[in-house]
Amino acid sequence: MVRVVASSVRGPSHVRDGLPCQDAGLAVADSRASIAVVCDGLGSRPDSKAGSRAATLAARDAWRLWRRSPVGSGEDLIRLVEVAWRLRLQGTPPDAAATTCLIYAEDGHGRAVLAQLGDGLIARRGSDGSVAVHPARTDGFGLTHALGAPHTLADWSFALSAPLAPGDALVLATDGVSEDLEPGRLGDLACWIIDDLASRPGAGRQLAHELRNWPVPRHQDDKTLLVMWKPCNPSSK
């Protein structure tokens, strides 16, 4: 069984302005297949909070259907997410609820998909300590791709992978976190959460405290960080 520690917090600018957190995260740790999602509602859109929350739920909805088949592709999962997101929005216009979407999803048939639309980070640390960062795609003009903003399937960055093996860990983060992380320290971040934070009572609350007290001067953005890992010993952390 995999384990998860995750938290989303408002950034100082939203605290100051009395606005809600526009990030969202979700994880399902299942004995056969797991999913992890983080989303960042675009701050320029009036319903971005609803958009990011709907995207996490849509990813879960899509995953539950997609994992039933041993032959579903990464493209199939993404198409399901796109449709499910619009259904989850109900009467909210998609362009008012634009959000990034980063997904790790296992199908229970020996495969996993990494999928990313927009900025943020998906990184995987192997049991040997190696770290691989999933490549994001940009439009080249400093704008981020997002659900609810003009994009195509080709704007998603996605790849098939093996599911998490014992000792592996996955890090998903919105840009409020990822932009301040040093690539060479991603493995250390995962180790800190797994070996230190996860052993404390209320690990999610402890992580939220760390995110609110982010050690970068003048940080402003909402922050979401999710770490999912598969212990080497099922009875250990």
Where do the PLM segments sit?
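Short, charged, surface-exposed loops that flank catalytic or proteolytic processing sites
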Residues: 66-78, 195-203
